[in-house]
Amino acid sequence: MDRVRPLAGGRNVRIREAVLNIDPYVPGKSKEEIAREYGIEPDEIVKLGSNENPLGPSPKAVKAAKRELERLHEYPEPLAPPSLYEAIIDYLADPPYPAGEPVEITREHLVVGGDGADEIIDVLTRVLVDPGDPVVIPVPTFSQYGISARACGAEVRKPRFDPERGFELDEDSLFEALDREVRLVYLCTPNNPTGNRIRERVVRDVVEECRGVVLIDHAYVEFADHDYTPLALEYDNVLVLRTCSKALGLAGARVGYGIANPELIEHLHRIKPVFSLTRPSAAAAEATFRDRDYIEKSVRLMIESRKYLYRELRKLDRLTPFPSEANYLLVDVSNTGMNASEFTEELLKRGVIVRDCSSFEGIEPFYVRVSTGTLEEDRKFIEVVKDVLEV
């Protein structure tokens, strides 16, 4: 039943119960926010909290975006420019990252989102889910799945990534949650925030058993040792979700894309907002997809950073980092005598931002997520952690 809430003007406005029961997304903290709160110059802050590309955007992307500023008075393409579709198609046909699996697709296999991958998550959920429909979201994972599902009034079933087994996905709880009524399964691999993969056999078993759609979120696939993108062509009930926010360095441009069978894509386009992809963002994305040297350099840097951080954090007795296939590490801080909130607060006082994972559903309040950085940023982070731990 919906509740009635009085607004400032004295009117009673009906707010849907499903909306009132949603916990809002908790984003990572920005440099500007920390600068205001702690009186630290933004240039002195090390931000390792939002899984961004520490190299910054491709210079070619910046140049391309600037060219489009002269046309801000004109609407962009309703969905995406044809040249951007072609750039994505070429990128997927010859992927410039270690585990990339080539796929041959057409424009009809693609949906491009102008609010990053979040837009596609939201549109896919609204296309498939009616109030009361069951969906499956293993936890802990990316919070946007639950927000979109609950906004549609879904019944959310929550199998778990098991912390006792290094956050491996618990197959028993996963398949107990699946039945013929499930409309949508959200699988993030590598998983955010844990960094580990979901094994291909498990993914295939879910896809073959599920009568609904399986969303495979590959936001971090450029850093991984696996690539399940070809499953979008092998199965008609799979959508593989990708983003330009991580390896491609365009988190601020908000560009995501999905690969699926053309019939499903057609249904997404029925309700996907038109003109949501701005001219500068589309131009920046196209230029980045074409800049293979930049992508290869970015991926190499972040994988090297991940290895360095894992190695150095393992040397500190009171911290437990988990192996990762993404551009971040999950770290257990329970042996420090602090919870995640207290630990991150100590880092913030010293000008270092990491992600307190307490807001993730299904995880104890003793985990932080550390993004990869430049070697200079990584070294400062380790020094600050040692200071906090008084090592």
Swiss-Prot record:
Gene3D superfamilies: Aspartate Aminotransferase, domain 1 (3.90.1150.10), Type I PLP-dependent aspartate aminotransferase-like (Major domain) (3.40.640.10)
EC numbers for this chain: 2.6.1.9
Pfam families, per the entry: Aminotran_1_2 (PF00155)
Required cofactor names: pyridoxal 5'-phosphate
UniProt keywords, alphabetically: Amino-acid biosynthesis, Aminotransferase, Histidine biosynthesis, Pyridoxal phosphate, Transferase
Domain of life (superkingdom): Archaea
Catalytic function, reaction form: L-histidinol phosphate + 2-oxoglutarate = 3-(imidazol-4-yl)-2-oxopropyl phosphate + L-glutamate
Protein family (similarity comment): Belongs to the class-II pyridoxal-phosphate-dependent aminotransferase family. Histidinol-phosphate aminotransferase subfamily.
NCBIfam families for this protein: hisC
Name of the featured protein: Histidinol-phosphate aminotransferase
Source organism: Methanopyrus kandleri (strain AV19 / DSM 6324 / JCM 9639 / NBRC 100938)
Source organism phylogeny: Archaea, Methanobacteriati, Methanobacteriota, Methanomada group, Methanopyri
Designated gene of the protein: hisC
